[in-house]
Amino acid sequence: PALLKLGIAKVVVQSGAGEAAGFPDDAYVDKGATIGSADDAWAADLVTAVRVLDADPQSPDLARVRPGQVIVGMAAPLAAPEVAGALAAKGATLYSLELVPRTTRAQAMDVLSSQANIAGYQAVLLAAEALPKVFPMLTTSAGTMSPARVLVIGAGVAGLSAIATSRRLGAVVEAYHVRDAAKEEVQSLGARV
């Protein structure tokens, strides 16, 4: 309904688009969207995607792109310039969100911070699952198990998230970053530099 109030006549969401993130099709319908096929979604004048063409210039979705279409999402144009080139060759306009500067003014469009935050969190959970011991120190009748020791290299958004998650799981955390200014952020999360 909010988009309809802005004059956007119709919002089509590809069936299953939000399933991996825990958003069923009904959640989009409840907000006024229509559920459709990939063809229905790509028929729009404005297409948004988390990963445009899955960063693959050979994606079958490329055949659905048409001249004048505007595509907004993450396309990795610096790492995979062939995707941007393929879209340009089709006459489409690409707004690659990972190139939006991280400024206060553009903060509402900052997709990298949220993605990096999740990546740091998930990295620790995957490491905790693979580690043959538990993260926190445990004292049992059989003895005491020392806490896991975690080294986080890099204290950007993902690194800070990894530090915070490791600490919450009970690990002893050390971090390294090339910026001296990161020292205070790392220490505020309870890690050593």
Question: What name fits each language-model region?
Answer:
Residues P1-F23, K133-V193:
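Glycine-rich phosphate/diphosphate-binding loop of Rossmann-like nucleotide-binding domains
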Residues F23, W42, R66, L78, ...:
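Conserved active-site and cofactor/substrate-binding residues in soluble primary-metabolism enzymes
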Residues Y28-G32, L112-Q115, G190-V193:
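Short, hinge-like loop/turn segments at secondary-structure boundaries
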Residues A55-R149:
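Glycine/serine-rich phosphate-binding loop and adjoining beta1-alpha1 elements at the start
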